[in-house]
Amino acid sequence: MKYYLSLFIQEFEKACKIAIRYKFDTIFNICFWAVLIVIVSHVLSTKHPGNIPIFVNSFMIWLITNNSFIAIVESIMKENTQGTLEQLYLNARSFYSLLTIKGVTASILSIIESMFTLSLCVLFEANVKLSMILQWIYILPLLFIAIFSLIGIGIACASFALRYKNISTFYSMVSAILFGILTYGAILLNKKPILMMLFPFAKANATIQLFFKGKNLINIDTYFIIIINDLIMMILGYVILKYYLKESKKTGSLSKF
């Protein structure tokens, strides 16, 4: 356990240093989404000002899930393209655990960047209140538990790179469309627990949306469904990764990047 905690700290420090080193890209990413939210909010304010908080919170959910998923996939693909994935695989520790830690690190950094985006919106959009940031801080524990479903599906998606090498267009489209649809339809699915367990981040998505509408459904049942969803997605990621690792070993392509 001490080993994994130390590894997580090292990975997080590494991710932060990379974000600072390439600060232009990091700042541009934060500001771009903030500007987009502010522009759409100003358009909405002319006819439906009351819908702005709903829009901002829904967009934040999509932004966190989309960016976290992409960050997870890209962190694994980077090991792939740099030729270091084989070294991780040969590590005496659990290969899947190492990838999971990378996924957790990428997700946390994406959540932090998204919170900076929301903070900028507070400065430039009157209908986005400081209390909204406090509400997001309140639901952070739920977010941190639910991100494991994103990590699982992210590892599953990144596994395709072992076979097809370049999948950037594929995972970008899957991410934008999948999490866009889930954010739009999460509340409709909320009454169907089985479906909530089968779609990544679906229960957390619906719970967060309802929370911002004044319906606090964060309880033991909610956490139970989220944890089951996490386990299903993590197992799915493990199975797909295992399959493509075997295929790569057969063809000898694991070290050929």
Q: Predicted segments — roles?
A:
Residues 53-123:
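Hydrophobic alpha-helical transmembrane segments of multi-pass membrane transport proteins
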Residues 106-164, 223-227:
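Alpha-helical transmembrane segments and their short interhelical loops
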Residues 10, 14-18, 78, 82, ...:
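Short amphipathic alpha-helical coupling elements at transmembrane boundaries
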Residues 21-46, 55-68, 176-180, 234:
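Hydrophobic alpha-helical transmembrane segments of multi-pass membrane transport/permease proteins
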Residues 6-10, 185-224:
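Short hydrophobic, aromatic-rich alpha-helical segments embedded in or entering the lipid bilayer
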